[in-house]
Amino acid sequence: VFFLKSYRKPRELTWLSGILLLFLMLGFGFSGYLLPWDELAYFATKVGTGIAGAVPIVGHFTLRLLRGGDDVTGATLSRFYGLHVAILPAVTTALVALHLLFVQQQGMSVPLSIERKLKPGERLPQMRFFPNYILRDVLAWYVVLAVLAALAAFYPWELGTKADPFA
C-alpha cells in the first residue's frame, strides 16, 4: 500500500474498504478466541475487553457492551458467538462485494513508474477480472487452506481446562 500509493485518487474508497476488511478480520480473531471457553480464552477475553474499558469517556460503556455486564460470563460467550457467526460474516460479505465493485470500477493500483510512462489520455492495459484475477485468488485460497489443514492435522491445538472463574 505504501510503495504503490494505493490510497491515492481515484482509489480512496477501495483502500478504505480494504482497511475496514482488515479490522473485520481482527474482529473475527478477537470474537472467535473466546469460543472454546477454556481458561486461556477466558482470561484473554477478560484482558481484551478490559483494554477496551480503559478508553476515556466511552470505555465503561464499551466494556459493558462487549461483556454483556460487568464480568466475563456466559452472556459474553453468547454475544461473541452471535457476533462471530452471524454479524461479522454478513458485514464481511457486503464489504467484500463493495470492495470488489470498487476494484472493478477503478482498476488495480499500479506503481507510479508505470503510470508516468503513459501518454496523456492513454489508459493502462487492463487484465480481465474473470478468469485471470478469480483464478489467481482461488489458487491462493486453496494453497492457504491446504497449509492450514496440514497445520491442524499435524499440530492440533489442544483445548485447555474449561473456564471456571470461581474455582
Predicted region positions:
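Membrane-embedded and interfacial regions of multi-pass energy-transducing membrane proteins
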Residues: F2-A167
